[in-house]
Amino acid sequence: MNNQIMTTYIGRLMDEFVQGGVQEAVVCPGSRSTPLAMLALAHQDINVHVLVDERSAAFYALGLAKASQTPVLLICTSGTAAANFYPAIVEAHYSRVPLIVLTADRPHELREVGAPQAIDQQFLFGKFVKWFTDLALPEESQMMLRYVQTAAARANHMSMQEPKGPVQINVPLREPLLPDLSIHPFDREETDRKKVLATGQAYPNDDALSEIVTVMNRSKKGLIVCGELHTQKEKEAVLRLSKDLHLPILADPLSHLRNGHEHAELIIDAYDSLLKDEALQQHLLPDMVIRFGPMPVSKPLFKWLEKHAEVNQIVVDAAGGFRDPGLSASYIIESDVAAFVDEVVNRADQREDTSFLNRWQHANSSFRTHASHYSDEDLSFEGNVYRQLQHLLPKESVLFIGNSMPIRDVDTFFEAQSKPFRMMANRGANGIDGVVSTALGTYAALKQPVTLVIGDLSFYHDMNGLLAAKLMDIPLTVVLLNNDGGGIFSFLPQASEEPYYEKLFGTPTGLNFEYASKLYGGTYSKPSTKQEFHDVYKAHIEEPGLHLIEIETDRHSRVSKHRQMMDDILEEVKKECLLS
């Protein structure tokens, strides 16, 4: 292959990505991907991040794209390199994150003939990518340059079209693989030619709106349930709906509604705990629910909504996805959040009755008041770590939350507050893998201090992700809650099967994580008191570099402490709310 032809062809591909909004590329080293990697680096408008492990790199790219909500290039060589992207692609699919995966490949004549480092990369990621194409080999005709430009434009468009998600372009390349950078590989300035594929905004159907407004006007006990939101516009729209119609908001931590605004009185942050009690479930039962975003993390909330399918439940989803795991939705409305709110607020009757909002506020306030009476000194009880951490986080920072117990504990213990910070997590497929790398990617996008709170098994899964912190000088403060195993299983029925539990589910590793931090050039601390944790965290969060703060907790006693605390608090809440 003439390397000037190849250079122009791949250069046109890269330049069109930039035209479509791409600014970042994550590159994994390899030979067959040489033209893709070098021309990405050569483009003045692409910022290239190089990571040597494909699984970590893919999650890092996921973090970049999740935080920026713009497409990120993810580049690898042929063979099993691309297969290591798979877990992150699955997460991107389910969490609706735009990724453009460029998998270099052998030319067609070297496929299925036993050539080295050649696997079948056609539709490698199956239904987890929105679009796939296998590029033609580079040619020099204007038609083929328009062809490769169109492929890039289409990839940009498809990744950003709702629901956002990953796409794959398979790029076969013949040797020689070194591009000729002496020519001008990006000819936009010469041709001023680009493709524009514009995405639209979903607006609610007028007939459906009329029916929904009728339901809203009849409702006396309306409620908003809010899962993960991505934009300030969405956040402001939900707050407007709540204020205008006096609807309490049950706000998931990832909704960005528990912090960063001055309307904490509208936010119910203790619903996960309140809905564990049957009497309170009935006391707080609505006659209408409007849900934005995916289902929140709270299992009691999910089971409550599932049980009460007789209640009108309206799900608003800009992509029209069927995100209704309880099969209890009465309406699924494909609409932009702000557009939906504008329409229903303008059409719905004005209401003055705040009694149902007050009922929720009373229960929420009662729970938080009684919870504050419990000592938060004992760090071996994980809840106390979260109760303290919420006050330590700096303004304009990011809390990246691990799956399994951390996201549930944040849901339980983090209260609504005005301090602005982001809470993020991988809640598409809810896996415990790739969390460290994703958190590092969020810093690369936002350049804000990042605190990662994570369990020991999840941290172990992605320890090699810490290499990015070392090589790219990314500051990261890790709060590692080490209960030496799978703590979440202690809350599940498996815990009652003592002969099997510890070996199959508890899975203690006995690892000394101090060595992991030192391996990647980080600091290590192991506070045992509230004051020590405060001092160590404050000393490190604004500093450059990797900082590992390990807190040993006890998963064996945690369950009984947690349940006893909840039982005691809920009894007090019921006395105040049901008997007053």
Curated annotation (Swiss-Prot):
EC number: 2.2.1.9
InterPro entries cross-referenced by the UniProt entry: DHS-like_NAD/FAD-binding_dom, MenaQ_synth_MenD, MenD_middle, THDP-binding, Thiamin_PyroP_enz_TPP-bd_dom, TPP_enzyme_TPP-bd
Cross-referenced Gene3D superfamilies: 3.40.50.970, TPP-binding domain
UniProt key word Manganese: yes
Pathway: Quinol/quinone metabolism; 1,4-dihydroxy-2-naphthoate biosynthesis; 1,4-dihydroxy-2-naphthoate from chorismate: step 2/7; Quinol/quinone metabolism; menaquinone biosynthesis
CC cofactor: Mg(2+); Mn(2+); thiamine diphosphate
Domain of life where this protein originates: Bacteria
Broad EC category: transferase
Co-factor binding comment: Binds 1 thiamine pyrophosphate per subunit.
Keywords recorded for this protein, A-Z: Magnesium, Manganese, Menaquinone biosynthesis, Metal-binding, Thiamine pyrophosphate, Transferase
Catalytic activity reported: isochorismate + 2-oxoglutarate + H(+) = 5-enolpyruvoyl-6-hydroxy-2-succinyl-cyclohex-3-ene-1-carboxylate + CO2
Pfam assignment, any one: TPP_enzyme_N
One MF annotation (Gene Ontology) recorded for this entry: 2-succinyl-5-enolpyruvyl-6-hydroxy-3-cyclohexene-1-carboxylic-acid synthase activity
Keyword flag Ribosomal protein: no
One of the GO biological process terms: menaquinone biosynthetic process
NCBIfam families the UniProt entry points to: menD
Subunit relationships: Homodimer.
PANTHER family linked: 2-SUCCINYL-5-ENOLPYRUVYL-6-HYDROXY-3-CYCLOHEXENE-1-CARBOXYLATE SYNTHASE, PROTEIN PHYLLO, CHLOROPLASTIC
Function recorded in the entry: Catalyzes the thiamine diphosphate-dependent decarboxylation of 2-oxoglutarate and the subsequent addition of the resulting succinic semialdehyde-thiamine pyrophosphate anion to isochorismate to yield 2-succinyl-5-enolpyruvyl-6-hydroxy-3-cyclohexene-1-carboxylate (SEPHCHC).
Similarity remark: Belongs to the TPP enzyme family. MenD subfamily.
Annotated protein name in UniProt: 2-succinyl-5-enolpyruvyl-6-hydroxy-3-cyclohexene-1-carboxylate synthase
Organism: Bacillus pumilus (strain SAFR-032)
